[in-house]
Amino acid sequence: MIQFTKMHGLGNDFMVVDGVTQNVFFSPEQIRRLADRNFGVGFDQLLLVEPPYDPDLDFHYRIFNADGGEVENCGNGARCFARFVRNKGLTNKNKIRVSTSAGKMTLRLERDGTVTVNMGVPVLDPSQIPFKAKKAEKTYLLQTSQQTFLCGAASMGNPHCVLDVEDVANANVAEIGALLTKHERFPRGVNVGFMQVVNSGHIKLRVYERGAAETLACGTGACAAVVVGQIQGKLDQQVRVDLPGGTLTINWEGEGKPLWMTGPAQHVYDGQIQL
């Protein structure tokens, strides 16, 4: 039997598994079955806590989408990861350093119950996102057989494309998201953000996630939207991001500087399941 915990960050929900005290392995087929909301546990992503690969770090953090594919990063998941390892007694630290397949992150548990995550320095170089473009631009033209889109692009350890919309509530997230998430100019696929700028310190956002479709919240998507909005001269250093599942606070001092994200992490229940 595998012990697990169900958690969520603003409705972006996770099955979190301790791979430190349990010997676990998940095949893509098993993950897809577990992710099924009718016949399994049901989640957007599976988060796996592993021992550190580096003695200077506390844990290794792995993320699997509902389709079974492993991805580089998940900001909402990182907050839940921090709360999980502390709640389960895997650490007594309030400041936790972890590695992911994309790099290293620092997670800080706050007194009010929220978690602040150092998401690292945003990547704007197209070759590193990866995104097929000759050079970095504030805005790119993205063509499909149906229409042309204006977008910004950035990586927070995973690739993001951000579109400006006038009214995010009425944005065609499902159709446009499905169209762009596998666009040929993003060799590894892309998460697609739909951003409505309310004012320079406040945006509304919906995100179509690569491998998971639209979710109630996407932490890296919120970060990428603020990065793109700042680069385009629309947003301040600190921005409130309203997602369907709730609110995040993003703070970024500009190019070359790390980005900080603060938000909640909620425990739902503990369970066990036979694979």
UniProtKB/Swiss-Prot annotation:
Transmembrane intervals: none
Domain of life: Bacteria
Key words, A-Z: Amino-acid biosynthesis, Cytoplasm, Isomerase, Lysine biosynthesis
Transmembrane helix as UniProt keyword: no
One Gene Ontology term from the biological process aspect of the record: lysine biosynthetic process via diaminopimelate
EC id: 5.1.1.7
One of the record's GO molecular function terms: diaminopimelate epimerase activity
Pathway listed: Amino-acid biosynthesis; L-lysine biosynthesis via DAP pathway; DL-2,6-diaminopimelate from LL-2,6-diaminopimelate: step 1/1
Compartments, record wording: Cytoplasm
GO CC annotations on file: cytosol
InterPro entries to which the protein is assigned, alphabetical: DAP_epimerase_AS (IPR018510), DAP_epimerase_DapF (IPR001653)
Site residues (Could be important to modulate the pK values of the two catalytic cysteine residues), renumbered to this chain: 160, 209
PANTHER family: DIAMINOPIMELATE EPIMERASE, DIAMINOPIMELATE EPIMERASE, CHLOROPLASTIC
Entry-linked HAMAP family: DAP_epimerase
Quaternary structure annotation from Swiss-Prot or TrEMBL: Homodimer.
Protein name from the UniProt record: Diaminopimelate epimerase
Lineage, opening ranks: Bacteria, Pseudomonadati, Pseudomonadota, Gammaproteobacteria, Alteromonadales
